[in-house]
């Protein structure tokens, strides 16, 4: 009987220590480019399109917003616009911040559609299908959203198993949308439900590789010039 009590006591300690372990993730979408400012909106993907002047300004503003926070290392996508954004954020911080290029955070490959508008890529019928059923999207020479979700899970596990307590991610719209689904354990059908504007900032508490708590999502009131300055928290529909 004593052994049974000892077992449950040790088990309770293990559960308690597991519950108390919490890490923090900051998410920042890369700054505006001429592709995202285009009213027709072009699929950027892995195309090397630099930040425009507003994108640079907003990246610095995001850096100011985070300047007093312990943001740890900044893990950024290899795509240049994400690296640019990360560099501007790091320069605004009060302590030296290490930048780490992370291939798992690279933007989606939109294959033959990269650089095209949604209309050019999908047309009316397929474009509507993309909005209603993003989980069914198949792009010639591109990457499926399921493949993206799998590689993002690998990054999440790698962070959880590391000694780091804080992780800051600078990546892209499609990547952050899918990360939000992982955080909320939502299906790919909800891909459009948790969007962030360029240089929007989100903060998430990670309690295990399966348990997350969103502190705030898409904070952007510091982007005074933004056309979409709504500081909203989107809800899963």
What residues fall within each predicted segment?
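Bacterial Sec-dependent signal peptides at the C-terminal "C-region" and cleavage site
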Residues: 12-22
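Residue-level preference for the first positions of well-ordered beta-strands
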Residues: 25, 164-170
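Phosphate-coordination/substrate-recognition cap region in phosphate-metabolizing enzymes
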Residues: 61-128, 194-196, 202
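Acidic, low-complexity terminal tails and accessory targeting/binding regions
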Residues: 20-23, 95, 108-119, 181-237
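Short beta-strand scaffold positions
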Residues: 76-77, 150, 170-171
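Sec-dependent signal peptide recognition
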Residues: 2-10
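Active-site-proximal alpha-helix that buttresses catalytic centers in soluble enzyme cores
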Residues: 23, 28-97, 141
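Short glycine/proline- and acidic residue-enriched helix-loop micro-motifs
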Residues: 128-147
């Amino acid at each position: 009987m004593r052994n049974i009590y000892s077992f449950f006591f040790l088990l309770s300690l293990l559960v308690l220590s597991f519950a108390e372990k919490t890490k923090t993730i900051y998410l920042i979408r890369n700054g505006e480019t001429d592709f995202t400012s285009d009213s027709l909106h072009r699929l950027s993907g892995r195309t090397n399109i630099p930040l425009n002047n507003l994108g640079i300004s907003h990246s610095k503003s995001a850096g100011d917003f985070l300047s007093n926070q312990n943001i740890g290392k900044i893990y950024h996508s290899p795509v240049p616009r994400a690296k640019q954004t990360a560099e501007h954020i790091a320069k605004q911080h009060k302590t030296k911040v290490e930048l780490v290029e992370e291939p798992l955070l690279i933007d989606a490959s939109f294959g033959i559609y990269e650089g095209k508008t949604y209309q050019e890529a999908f047309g009316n019928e397929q474009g509507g299908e993309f909005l209603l059923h993003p989980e069914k999207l198949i792009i010639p020479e591109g990457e499926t959203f399921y493949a993206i979700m799998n590689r993002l899970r690998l990054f999440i596990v790698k962070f959880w198993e590391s000694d780091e307590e804080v992780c800051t991610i600078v990546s892209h719209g499609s990547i952050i949308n899918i990360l939000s689904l992982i955080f909320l354990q939502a299906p790919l059908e909800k891909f459009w439900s948790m969007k962030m504007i360029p240089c929007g900032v989100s903060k998430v508490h990670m309690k295990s590789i399966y348990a997350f708590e969103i502190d705030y999502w898409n904070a952007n009131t510091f982007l005074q010039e933004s056309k979409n300055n709504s500081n909203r928290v989107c809800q899963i529909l």
